[in-house]
Amino acid sequence: MSLISRLRAVVAGDDFLDSDFDELEYDSSDDFENFNRGNKEGSTEMATISQANPFDGRSGFPPSNVIGMPGISTNDSEVSLMEPRSFDEMPRVIQALRERKTVILNLTMMEPDQAQRAVDFVAGGTFAIDGHQERVGESIFLFAPSCVTVTNSFQEEASPSNMSNKGNDLISKETSPAPEPAWGETVATAL
């Protein structure tokens, strides 16, 4: 049969082409029944496949090249208390901040000029990572990474001891110069 005669038969709707195809004897119901009742291994494989987590890294795919940020975890946050004796220990403070640890820095063991230099250094590092800093006490500072929110909830409550002196405190605060730094002596300047 030529190609042209086949095309004519298709256009004319001739049933002659139906006999060209070989019929395969295939009973699909037998396979379905075998799968449902006798093939326990197949059903457990299907159950395993359907219950598998597609996002699980151990499912036959090579590990990802994504590197997580240091210090981010679902574990509790860590607070480090550091009492440096020299400026040489300040890079450890910056490293702790980079690892997203909150640092309480006690500078009472340092010389006043070294303590000022240390605070400036750590404050610059904290600023670079968008962190927060708070002065907690005399020569004691709190430095926190950006993932930690620092709030100052200390507000003086009214009590009988501070109610009587409240007016006098306001007057003395208005006339007093800037507060003294936490370290060293200050030289009084004439206004």
Swiss-Prot record:
GO biological process annotation, one example: division septum assembly
GO cellular component: cytoplasm
Organism for this UniProt entry: Prochlorococcus marinus (strain NATL1A)
Functional summary from the UniProt entry: Cell division protein that is part of the divisome complex and is recruited early to the Z-ring. Probably stimulates Z-ring formation, perhaps through the cross-linking of FtsZ protofilaments. Its function overlaps with FtsA.
Keyword presence, Cell cycle: yes
Stated name of the protein: Cell division protein SepF
Region (Disordered), start-end ranges: 156-191
Pfam families, A to Z: SepF
Source taxonomy: Bacteria, Bacillati, Cyanobacteriota, Cyanophyceae, Synechococcales
